[in-house]
Swiss-Prot record:
Gene Ontology MF terms: coenzyme F420 hydrogenase activity; flavin adenine dinucleotide binding; iron-sulfur cluster binding; nickel cation binding; oxidoreductase activity, acting on CH or CH2 groups, with an iron-sulfur protein as acceptor
Assembly, per entry: Heterocomplex of the form (alpha(1)beta(1)gamma(1))(8).
The protein, known as: Coenzyme F420 hydrogenase subunit beta
InterPro entries the UniProt entry points to: Co_F420_Hydgase/DH_bsu_N, FRHB/FDHB/HCAR-like, FrhB_archaea, FrhB_FdhB_C
Amino acid sequence: MVLGTYKEIVSARSTDREIQKLAQDGGIVTGLLAYALDEGIIEGAVVAGPGKEFWKPEPMVAMTSDELKAAAGTKYTFSPNVLMLKKAVRQYGIEKLGTVAIPCQTMGIRKAQTYPFGVRFVADKIKLLVGIYCMENFPYTSLQTFICEKLGLNMELVEKMDIGKGKFWVYTQDDVYTLPLKETHGYEQAGCKICKDYVAELADVSTGSVGSPDGWSTVITRTDSGDSILKQAVEAGIFETKPIEEVKPGLGLLEKLSAQKKEKAEKNIAARKEMGLPTPY
């Protein structure tokens, strides 16, 4: 299955106007973690918060809805959230922890839960793992190349970034700039080339924009707990949803991109094996 094991797939968006303004797409990550926090399902969440440099995120422990909102929006460079999990449990004393992760981080967290040596009494505290779709991730220096060198902008002027329709989008207060995705090839993290997971197949809930209209997100529930929390949030009016079959561009595009990432990774893994280089699979 190109999308992994799942319970249900819907198109959804937050009903909170403030979250809608802050979020990348439908506000699912922020809204779901905030709901779980308010309901006592979790006591805090590890998220990618703002860093000392513009658009260079740093992992943070969010204990309130306002802190979650401060971390809203996608950052296209790496935030080492997994490193913050131990601190969240041992220094903040969190017994029920939520976190957001890209697919490779999701895999690492599940491995820690399966083989908890070195993170004993930490992995079992994770009660909600929200995964976000990811085709590739860029080093911060690559973002600087795209924005500062190729587009001629200062990082501090950027209000939002996005990837879609074959382009890398950069939004400022006054204008919108685009860069063909082909010009970003070769700048991604090296590990992205051998990663097979586009849709965070091991998360409790996976989400991203692909497959849904602008302002909405495609949400995949994968575990009993993830499915239950999302349904509770919908019943509480936190999200509005539509059947994925009734929206455009629809599930076909998500399946296509997921399959493409798997195929590309398989080819790169085979090439590495031929050269005698290590592979993760």
